[in-house]
């Protein structure tokens, strides 16, 4: 049986490679893959025709920083201790499905913030095998962290040590010491992780720490990175403090998440070493582009930290904007939008002066490189998966354009689309 042919007529066309929108291009899809692309491409008689001449066609988008294991950001903390692991796995399925409907054909899960298990690997594999529908998942089920750290949600029970101690045991990658973390890396690789995630500093979401607080010592981080590299996998770190970012670079980390308190010296080190950063602008946008009403919607400690670090966040955003750091597009929504509404990050990048092409490239080509799947997706090229999205709103002038996907195809199959609930 011959593979299905699909002929796509593009209005505007962005391939993820060149910083331009081309007009009048066509894409021929054969089965799962892009077969041919060009302005003068003829349509085979047997091909199904999809007319997107009134839309901008792009690669399927990629969100490089998601936490998929909750249903609603308003109740994320309650879900951590009130939902079963089975229910948390269902939330991952739902997030993957909704992300795909929004034009994001691949997502990266940066560790469970409610879940303690490995349900995300089951969902990842089931999607890959075609058993269920959803965005392709690249995942670390758990992050490596220390007691009392940003990754230790038993901070909520710090006033009840007996309960905190019992709950802490459920987090098998939460501990201390070089040998503990060497073993943790080996176990996560054994269980099927796609990469290693560590919590190097405190954060904004957790109640009892600071984003400048060092939460893994140099011996621990060096051991984690070395062990991961020996096993052929990569490491990324949740981190804010410039001194910690510099230390991680010296220890040859592959990339980092957030980096919102960036300074010039640290940015230069990123540039010189080719270390990537997924800056997750949106969670701090209410402080950078000050909006007291939106800040008031966040959890109390998040509000307080945004107010306290507002000036540093503004300065850090500008350092990132003017740098030549390799930047990925990721959302990290736990306190302002639903985790599958990845298009909100586009608004944050555009409002920060990043420009449409820099943002689109981060969400396509660069993200595919960060995730290690650039040979399969991220750009529109013959031989790659037919991961294709289309948008009817103007990507150059409409900051909310990525919240309203008009068409999505993943591996040659067309799926229904769904706009954000917030537009």
Question: Which positions does each model-derived feature cover?
Answer:
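N-terminal metal-binding scaffold of metallo-dependent hydrolase/deaminase domains
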Residues: 1-44, 57, 393-399, 413-414
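C-terminal cap of metal-dependent C-N hydrolases
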Residues: 11, 15, 31, 363-365, ...
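Metal-associated gating/positioning segment near the N- to mid-region
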Residues: 55-129, 147, 219, 248-251
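Active-site gating loops and adjacent loop-to-helix segments of metal-dependent hydrolytic enzymes
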Residues: 68-88, 147-169, 203-217, 273-310, ...
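Histidine/acidic-residue-rich catalytic or RNA/ligand-binding cores of hydrolases
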Residues: 75, 120, 150-152, 207, ...
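His/Asp/Glu-enriched, well-ordered alpha-helical/loop segment
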Residues: 80, 230, 300-301, 310-395, ...
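Divalent metal-dependent hydrolysis catalytic cores, especially in the metallo-beta-lactamase
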Residues: 93-119, 133-143, 193-206, 234, ...
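Alpha-helix-loop-beta-strand connector modules within alpha/beta enzyme cores
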Residues: 125-142, 212-237, 278-282
